[in-house]
Amino acid sequence: DLPDLELYLDQVLLYVNQVTQLSQATDHKLLTASMINNYVKHGYIDKPIKKKYQKKQVARLIAISILKNVFPIQDISQVLTSLQAASSSEVLYDTFVNYWNNGLTQSTPEIISYACQTVKDYQHTMKLSREMEDTKHEPNL
């Protein structure tokens, strides 16, 4: 669940990095203050109100953090904006997390299921690649 309180930047960083590290491969790059500032500057997330970020912005940052290794951020932002026209950020976040953790449900929009599966396939491919590299460097016994 997303925090009910509005968060300052340092709290957002801690929360988003904690949540996304649980679902990412070990080579996942942590979210930084500069990244958030750039996302705000480019309109990928709304500006904080009185330096505080709301649930909607935190949910969007989590989605961007998970999806950015596979999809261009501009595309992620465009799709999220389109999805938010039909559902609230909280409903979309819950749908995304539910699919990510449990797989397909009947109410999962196809675009969310394909995006999640693409990220999981990418992570699995990278894991296999690392394993291949590790076996190359093992001495023959």
Say what each PLM segment does.
Residues 79-141:
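Intrinsically disordered, low-complexity, charge-dense segments enriched in Lys/Arg
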Residues 1-82:
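Basic helix-turn-helix/winged-helix DNA-binding cores
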